[in-house]
UniProtKB/Swiss-Prot annotation:
Cystine crosslinks: C98-C322
Ligand binding ([4Fe-4S] cluster): C105, C109, C112
Record protein name field: Probable RNA methyltransferase Mpe_A3613
Family to which this protein belongs: Belongs to the radical SAM superfamily. RlmN family.
Manner of cofactor binding, per the entry note: Binds 1 [4Fe-4S] cluster. The cluster is coordinated with 3 cysteines and an exchangeable S-adenosyl-L-methionine.
Family annotation (NCBIfam families): PRK14464.1
Organism of this sequence: Methylibium petroleiphilum (strain ATCC BAA-1232 / LMG 22953 / PM1)
Keyword hit for rRNA-binding: no
Enzyme class: transferase
Membrane-traversing stretches: none
Keyword match Membrane: no
Localization annotation: Cytoplasm
Length: 352
């Protein structure tokens, strides 16, 4: 379901714009539709009579199948959709929520569990917001990051529609809505045009174009320099820095040569580098580097003029890597290995 379809249904029941916003606010904020102030209790009769069935339908868009709490205060939610498919959401410490935008993913990042199964279907904008409503039934949600299963750029209309609602009726500050992408020209065209302009996170992972093409095999072929240039323009236009995501993988992208590349790209930019040690996935032949190495990299980048945050992967003890919980429920995994090609400085990907 798309939010626009929901709006059309409300209008057919006699809702005026204020009525629409009231119903959508109650839904997105997980407030019972039947509990309204006297001022709000002026909905048209047909709409009031339809509310119980409507509320049940909206709740059915995303239902909790299982919850797995972690020691760091995060909790991974396996969410069942109305058609029986499942996606993952993650309740993050400090009132954050990570939501999914697709069932599966077409980018095929070789270190990501979600990417191994390909794309099954898009989520409708209402299904995306429904994850927020479901989470708000558990705890407060003041920040939403679109970093769960799926590539938001590949479901752009639905994601932007969800962002518009969350940034208005949903009561979430625009900079606390974080659109995460591997990079796509359509994103850089569309985001500046929206009434709600989210913060932007770009999945960089390496400064080497050839290695990035292997790690993210079906991502658009945008050179790291061009990706950063796009990000810088958006950051200056919105007034909040771009977050660059870097999944630290032992022996793959944690070398001193990558440090030099990051400094070349990001020193002096309106940017934050997020170093995220790899969240180990059963069946994938990647490992996180030693914590001491991650700390050393963050410190070196700070000293060389790149604002850097070293993040512990949320939910490491509850299968916190993207797609792990769903894969565990479905069963199956595929081994992937990246090895240096002797004498070339490049890397070779083996899948078996």
């Amino acid at each position: 379901m798309r939010i626009e379809q929901l709006r059309e249904h409300l209008r057919a029941l006699g809702a005026r714009p204020g009525h629409e916003q009231s119903v959508l606010r109650h839904w997105a904020c997980a407030l019972p539709q039947q509990r309204r102030s006297a001022r709000e209790d002026v909905l048209p009769l047909a709409l009031r009579e339809a509310l119980p069935a409507l509320e049940a339908e909206l709740q059915g868009l995303a239902r909790l199948r299982s919850e797995h709490s972690a020691e760091d205060g995060s909790a991974r939610l396996l969410v069942a959709l109305a058609d029986g498919q499942t996606v993952e959401s993650v309740l993050l410490p400090r009132d954050g929520l990570c939501v999914s935008t697709q069932v599966g993913c077409a980018v095929g990042c070789v270190f990501c569990m979600t990417g191994q199964g390909g794309l099954l279907r898009q989520l409708g904008s209402a299904e995306i917001v429904a994850q927020v409503a479901l989470a708000r039934g558990h705890r407060a949600v003041k920040k939403v990051v679109f970093m769960g299963m799926g590539e938001p750029a590949h479901n752009l209309d639905n994601v932007l529609e969800a962002i518009e609602l969350l940034g208005t009726a949903g009561g979430i500050g625009h900079k606390n809505l974080v659109f995460s992408t591997v990079g796509d020209e359509r994103v850089f065209e569309r985001l500046p045009q929206g009434a709600v302009k989210p913060a932007l996170a770009l999945s960089l992972h390496t400064t080497k174009p050839e290695l990035r093409a292997q790690l993210l095999p079906r991502a658009p072929r945008i050179a790291p320099e061009d990706l950063v240039a796009h990000g810088e323009r958006y950051a200056r236009a919105t007034g909040y820095p771009v977050q660059y995501q870097w999944t630290l993988i032992d022996g793959v992208n944690d070398g001193d040569d990558e440090l030099d590349g990051i400094v070349r790209l990001l020193a002096g930019r309106y940017a934050v580098m997020n170093l995220i040690p790899y969240n180990t996935v059963d069946g994938l032949a990647f490992q996180r580097p030693a914590w001491e190495r991650a700390v050393a990299m963050a410190g070196a980048l700070h000293r060389r003029g790149v604002l850097t945050k070293l993040r512990r992967s949320a939910g490491q003890d509850v299968e916190g890597g993207c797609g792990q919980l769903r894969a565990r429920a479905l069963g199956g995994a595929r081994w992937i290995k990246i090895e240096p090609v002797s004498g070339t400085g490049a890397h070779h990907v083996d899948q078996f």
